[in-house]
Amino acid sequence: MSKRRYTYYQPNDKDLKDNYGDCAIRTICKAENLSWLDAYDMMYRLSREVQCPMNCKYGFEHILKSKGYVYTGISNKKGTKRPTVDSFTKEHLEGTYVLIVANHYVCSKDGHYFDIWDSGECSMYGYWVKEE
């Protein structure tokens, strides 16, 4: 069995026990190389434009689009399996991706995924990739 590509990532030094439920902010921090506060401020400003919370699907999509990300959905046709966070990351060794799983966001960057827990077995529903 091959090695997982998971790296623990917690940019919020106030969340000592990983209890804040701020995966949207953590994901943007890593994807955009921002501090937690800078990511929060940017996301708050952009979510105000559409008057939708930053971690709500529509609000988060608005933020990603405004930063140059493009969405790709993952089909779940009969007889097929969705890729997991770990399998997707192993196949995408370059680039920055925001991965969508059930009720959670994960950043995959240059062949590693970053989270406060090993979300590698989670099945993906889609992903956002930053167009350069």
Identify the function of each model-found stretch.
Residues 10, 101, 130-131:
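Surface-exposed beta-strand edges and flanking loops
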Residues 1-53, 57-72:
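Active-site nucleophile-adjacent alpha helix/oxyanion-hole segment immediately C-terminal to the catalytic cysteine
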Residues 47-103, 109-118:
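Conserved active-site-adjacent core of cysteine acyl-enzyme catalytic domains
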Residues 28-32, 89, 132:
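Extracellular and analogous surface-interaction loops
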Residues 113-132:
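Noncatalytic regulatory segments and standalone regulatory/sensor domains
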Residues 4-7, 95, 123-125:
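Intrinsically disordered, low-complexity segments enriched in small/polar residues
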